[in-house]
Amino acid sequence: MNFTKILFFVVACVFAMRTVSAAPWNPFKELEKVGQRVRDAVISAGPAVATVAQATALAKGK
């Protein structure tokens, strides 16, 4: 009996929080932000990768 009361309370709280939110959650916008972060990380890592490649080539004697 207590479990059903607790479950009902949790579901009611979640429902209230979902209906009060100002802006709807857009998963595609979040996915786009993640893609931009990955793109920026790859761009910023480019010079470091080139430096490591040069160091490896020098170490091998090529």
Swiss-Prot record:
Major place of residence: secreted
Sites of Lysine amide modification: 60
Signal sequence region: 1-22
BP terms from Gene Ontology: antibacterial humoral response; defense response to Gram-positive bacterium; innate immune response
Residue positions assigned to the propeptide: 23-24
Keyword Transmembrane part of the UniProt annotation: no
Family to which the UniProt record says this protein belongs: Belongs to the cecropin family.
Protein name per the record: Cecropin-D
Species assigned in the record: Hyalophora cecropia
